[in-house]
Amino acid sequence: MRLLFVLLLSSVVASADRPNVVLVMADDQGWGQTGYYNHPVLKTPHLDAMAAAGLRFDRFYAGGPVCSPTRATVLTGRSHDRTGVFDHGFALRSQEKTLARALQRAGYATGHFGKWHLNGLRGPGVPILKDDTHSPGKVGFDVWLSVTNFFERDPLLSRM
């Protein structure tokens, strides 16, 4: 009887739909910089709607002082001194074990959309192509629509 229960339970678990996994990451956003935390200036209607439905971003911590080390830390679970991504301009090594690769092994389709900033120094807004040696595809993303970085190093363009 116990074996039958285990078999039935495993078949139910195997047939259950897997949850979608979406990681939202914003550069240089403080914990109180959302509408649902009553920021006096910033408007975040989509985040506010998710918070009203029960999803609040209140347990996420940066792995480094700037975006590239933090991105590497999030993707690998390792500190930036272990990934070798110490600052802007350092590429994530393709041999790193990443969250994207783990999700692929579990049968998920993976994608990256937005700022990558883990492929070394490139000009702002440069698209990341399939043959880039440090593309999202090299660390476990099936598809991506990503650019190297945005205009944070140009005082004029960063305001546009």
Language-model segment annotations:
Residues 3-13:
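Sec-dependent N-terminal signal peptides
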Residues 15-160:
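Formylglycine-dependent sulfatase
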